[in-house]
């Protein structure tokens, strides 16, 4: 087939000006001013240009990759405390993407391995937020998977390949981009073995899922249906290489501190045994810092799975001071978010310091960490947010400790008038 200008066809045999093939040897011959180029040469030129562009992009991304100190500094803007975890994550992520930038260099005999990460910490301590912030900072595709929904292939539930499908959806099914992404698998502690003893029944949502995740996390070519379709034999699959995807697994691992304490303290029975009170015991965060791979195996993770997660980072339980900082200091702090909502109604929102302390105390009592702060503030501000759009004359709302405790309503300050506050209704 030949393309010529103005439909002209001289009737004589035409040849590609670059490779010399005739019009009968190629699928398409494109005409220019006194020259011709075939489809094969066009493809070759495209490949050359694509390689040069990719090399340039790799070099520029290598220059743009922030140092571990810079990564940790950016994490500080969004996540309060957890300095040790930030340092571990910053170094691991920096080394991971440095490894990706070096992988295509020729003549380098040393092959760098991948270091996936395991985050251990109480609920609401910032595990998911750390992973989300890292992905946003590095501008790479990011997805969160819930380990509790995963089952072995062939059983009711999600296959592990669905994790890669979610990652592809985040980057419009661009396989190259997906292969540089970050996957955060939450609630990883929930797929621990149900028992140390072998059972005649198959553990399809525990050890079975760990086995299924092994190759995916270590690095394999996963077959994923295009555009979220269901698998069937006649379908063409997208092939995604997971060797360069960074997997971050996180979980609360409730009870792991007891496993660690049993290992690290001398046990004894009888009259000579040392009696230790609860007060003498360490805090959960302090115990978790001493975690070793054997402790995770005793908890219920299989040794092969623990081996695929060489980087361990533990997060501390948040105290009252840290929760107060979370309410006010980060870029997207909750008090700033609610102040923005009220600002849209031309109303100033003020939280007194005693109110912030009361919110932090309530969150500690509920044992929900930073995650519980929003639900407390939502409950406190519900009535006010309901009324404010209808009261155009309100200029400021003040929240103090009594409002958080439920003994009074927020103080509303009206334009050109005295402040008004309603007593809380009797329970």
Curated annotation (Swiss-Prot):
Q: How does it assemble?
A: Component of the ClpX-ClpP complex. Forms a hexameric ring that, in the presence of ATP, binds to fourteen ClpP subunits assembled into a disk-like structure with a central cavity, resembling the structure of eukaryotic proteasomes.
Q: What family is reported?
A: Belongs to the ClpX chaperone family.
Q: Any stretches that span the bilayer, and where are they?
A: none
- NAD is among the record's keywords: no
Query: In its UniProt entry, what is this protein called?
Result: ATP-dependent Clp protease ATP-binding subunit ClpX
* HAMAP family per record: ClpX
Q: Which PROSITE patterns match?
A: CLPX_ZB
Q: What InterPro entries does the database record attribute to this sequence? A: AAA+_ATPase, ATP-dep_Clp_protease_ClpX, ATPase_AAA_core, Clp_ATPase_C, Clp_protease_ATP-bd_su_ClpX, ClpX_bact, P-loop_NTPase, Znf_CppX_C4
The task this protein performs is described as:
ATP-dependent specificity component of the Clp protease. It directs the protease to specific substrates. Can perform chaperone functions in the absence of ClpP.
UniProt KW keywords:
ATP-binding, Chaperone, Metal-binding, Nucleotide-binding, Zinc
The superkingdom listed in its UniProt entry is: Bacteria
Q: Which GO terms describe its molecular function?
A: ATP binding; ATP hydrolysis activity; ATP-dependent protein folding chaperone; protein dimerization activity; unfolded protein binding; zinc ion binding
Q: Which gene encodes it?
A: clpX
Instruction: Show where the ClpX-type ZB domain sits.
Output: 4-57
Q: Write out the residues that bind ATP.
A: 122-129
Q: Which organism is it from?
A: Pseudomonas putida (strain GB-1)
């Amino acid at each position: 087939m030949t393309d010529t200008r103005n439909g002209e066809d001289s009737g004589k045999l035409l040849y590609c000006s670059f490779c010399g093939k005739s019009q009968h040897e190629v699928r398409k011959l494109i005409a220019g001013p006194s020259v011709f180029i075939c489809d094969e040469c066009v493809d070759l030129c495209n490949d050359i240009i694509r390689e040069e562009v990719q090399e340039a992009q790799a070099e520029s991304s290598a220059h743009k990759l922030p140092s571990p100190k810079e990564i940790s500094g950016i994490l500080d803007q969004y996540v309060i405390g957890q300095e040790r975890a930030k340092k571990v994550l910053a170094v691991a992520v920096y080394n991971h993407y440095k490894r990706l930038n070096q992988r295509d260099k020729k003549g380098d005999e040393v092959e760098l391995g991948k270091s996936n990460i395991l985050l251990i910490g109480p609920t609401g301590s910032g595990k998911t937020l750390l992973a989300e912030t890292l992905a946003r900072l590095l501008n790479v595709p990011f997805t969160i998977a819930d380990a509790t929904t995963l089952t072995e292939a062939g059983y009711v539930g999600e296959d592990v390949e669905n994790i890669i499908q979610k990652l592809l959806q985040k980057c419009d099914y661009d396989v190259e981009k997906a292969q540089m992404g970050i996957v955060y698998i939450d609630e990883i502690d929930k797929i621990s073995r149900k028992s140390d003893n072998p059972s005649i029944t198959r553990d399809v949502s525990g050890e079975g899922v760990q086995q299924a995740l092994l190759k995916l996390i270590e690095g394999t070519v996963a077959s994923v249906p295009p555009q979220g379709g269901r698998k069937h034999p006649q379908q063409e699959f997208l092939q995604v290489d997971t060797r360069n995807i960074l997997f971050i697994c996180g979980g609360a691992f409730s009870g792991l501190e007891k496993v660690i304490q049993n290992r690290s303290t001398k046990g004894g029975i009888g009259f000579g045994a040392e009696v230790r009170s609860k007060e003498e015991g360490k805090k959960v965060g302090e115990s978790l810092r001493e975690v070793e791979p054997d402790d995770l195996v005793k908890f219920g993770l299989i040794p092969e799975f623990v081996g695929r997660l060489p980087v361990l980072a533990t997060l501390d339980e948040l105290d009252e001071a840290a929760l107060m900082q979370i309410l006010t200091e980060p870029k997207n702090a909750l008090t700033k978010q609610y102040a923005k909502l009220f600002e849209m109604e031309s109303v100033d929102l003020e939280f007194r310091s005693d109110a912030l302390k009361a919110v932090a105390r309530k969150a500690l009592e509920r044992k929900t960490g930073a995650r519980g702060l929003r639900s407390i503030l939502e409950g406190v501000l519900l009535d006010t947010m309901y009324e404010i759009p209808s009261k155009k004359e309100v200029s400021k709302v003040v929240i103090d400790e009594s409002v958080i405790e439920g003994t009074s309503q927020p103080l509303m300050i009206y334009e050109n008038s005295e402040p008004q506050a309603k007593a809380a209704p009797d329970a």
